[in-house]
Amino acid sequence: MTSLQQQQQQQRVKYGPPHHIKRRPYHPILESLEFQTNQHLIQEYSLDIVNTLSQLESLTLVNPAMIDLQPEIQWFMRPFLLDFLIELHSSFKLQPTTLFLCLNIIDRYCAKRIVFKRHYQLVGCTALWIASKYEDKKSRVPTLKELTIMCRNAYDEEMFVQMEMHILSTLDWSIGHPTLEDCLQLAIDSNNLSNNTTNDIENKSVRPNRKSSISSAVTAVARFLCELSLYDKYFLSVPPSLIAITANLLSCSMLQIPHASITLKNLIEQEIINPQQKKQKKAFSSNSSRTTTASYTHQNQSDVRHSSFDEDIDLDSGDEGDDDEDYIDEFYETNNYDDTNATTFDESINKSTTINDENQPPQIHTPFLSGLDEDSILSIKKICLMLIIQLSKVTEVLSKKYENLGVIQVINNFHSNYKFIIQSIYENQELLLNTINDSTNNNEIDYKLIQSSEILLQFPKFDEYLTEDEDENVSTDDEANSQPQGYDGSGSDGNNQLFTPKSPNAFSSNSSLTLNNHPQSMVPVTPPSATSQYSLFSNKNNRTHESTSGLNSTCNTPTHISISSFAPPQPPPGSILKPKLTSINSTNSLKIKKLTSNSNSSNINIHHGHHNTKQEKRYSHISIGSNSSSKYDGFSPIKSISTNGSLITNNGSFTNIVNNTNSSSPLMNQQQQYYHQQQHQQQVTQSSLYQHHHQYHQ
């Protein structure tokens, strides 16, 4: 019986879809043929695709001022919802475009309808459901049961259906939008990255349609920056194409790839610099022709009347009939011909076409969907500054998502290479946010901040092409500041040169963007790690003097990951980075180390006994030996070097070393020179006091 039952069970018919089917590998020849035909079809419709995306970009922009009018929803709730949607997106393994389209649907709906606090999560999940239907395949679309489970049964299945109908009717059933992923792919394709993969059909491990390692790395870092831009309010008012272009430039700069900078340079030269140079040449030629004709007519005037002013007053008075004769004489003297009415049919057509071209939309270039002009270039630099500020607010969900891909390590290396510039941006973020949010002063951003964004982006340099404002700023900076040679590529003939990425610090001592501009430095949003340079645990002397009581709840992100490079480094108040030192007479603010010059060291002998006690009382404000080292001595990466080329040890002795000033930044060198001058004056005054005291006791 057992054998018969087993046979019957084996012969039972199973209904439904088959289970546990092994996937067969797709044939490489078919894959290569499909890839080639797909690329051929896309190239035929490339112009139509770009034009459609540019039209959708202008139609689907979100006004953040309308979201400000929401009675219950606040901007600090956005990161919480976004973290939840990122977790859902990664758990369902949806396409990257789905997440960006979901956020656009949420913002467009919140800009038109009032959303209550209890329905904010319902709107987000329904928008993700709509976007997955629009972008992903059917098997990846989450079901209503899964959405209710993810929301912990806070909403019924019918509520998702009702909210879907309400969102679609509010948006007039127009869901299409050029997402950040679409614009990012256009920007990466314009980089012309070399494809390292081969079309070898026999090698099945390498697919012909797989991107190269370079393009995949650029895509990962740029996608991280695009997702980071979703957290802030400012990026809603900027076209997504410019955000994607900035993310592409910044990712190539982080990976030290020059392709994006080269393509941007070629575009700017073709579309901005060359037309302006042609206009300038035409204007110069027209002005020169006018001057030459004027000189020739002046030379041809043989009958010039030389008379006094009194004689010219009554000249031709009463001879009104001679006006026509005077006009005829002037006409033959100048030999000018009025051709206002002598135009042909072709010339009239050309004039009408030029007039109509002025009212046409700007010409679309492949990554720039909103047009390429000087305003778009300036907005790219602003977006770069805002992305650098957003790097200090990375949430734990976003960092875990990209940690396995190596994106976090790339950003840490980028921060360590440009830490002085990034630190200055963090110091002046309040000024930057005020100027960006203010509509009247939108274009009045500090030139040093713009220059720092150019360094971070590896922005192409144009030595011949500078605007009038940049010429004035560069000339005033060169006159006011005397920077050492070797920086920014400016030697003896280094005027009007922008800073190169090889010199990470682009600031001078006379600038308002000093590293310690504010008396209270900003508390880092993310706690520093134990291995970082600016960590509180990196130095043994820094254990008991610091506390985290200064942290408050004003941050707009829910949970921050402890990555030291994302947090703005905090310069201590007593470090060498301070731009202005106090006077020598102030005993509380400045402590002088007990030093003796090499020339007077053999002649000065301080006796032991009660004289030393008096001397210690008299010079109690002078710190001696190891007591002089404050808790912030280990902060600066540049050690303090004395004027005679010797390093000061903790015991008060000297060890002769080579006087090698740090060449990392001109700001540090200028501040060190000022500090050394003050220290030298203090040594001279101190040695004279010791000599006077020694002679008095003798």
Swiss-Prot record:
Polar residues bias locations: 277-302, 493-520, 528-567, 659-669
Entry-linked InterPro entries: Cyclin (IPR039361), Cyclin-like_dom (IPR013763), Cyclin-like_sf (IPR036915), Cyclin_C-dom (IPR004367), Cyclin_CLN (IPR014399), Cyclin_N (IPR006671), Cyclins_cyclin-box (IPR048258)
Protein keywords: Cell cycle, Cell division, Cyclin
A Pfam family: Cyclin_N
Location of the region described as Disordered in the Swiss-Prot/TrEMBL record: 1-21, 277-326, 469-577, 599-619, 659-698
Compositionally biased residues, Low complexity: 1-11, 670-690
GO MF: cyclin-dependent protein serine/threonine kinase regulator activity
Gene Ontology biological process terms in this record: cell division; filamentous growth; regulation of G1/S transition of mitotic cell cycle
Keyword Cell cycle: yes
Top-level taxon in the UniProt lineage: Eukaryota
Residue pairs linked by disulfide bridges in the UniProt entry: none
PANTHER family: CYCLINS (PTHR10177)
Sequence similarity: Belongs to the cyclin family.
Entry protein name: G1/S-specific cyclin CCN1
Species: Candida albicans (strain WO-1)
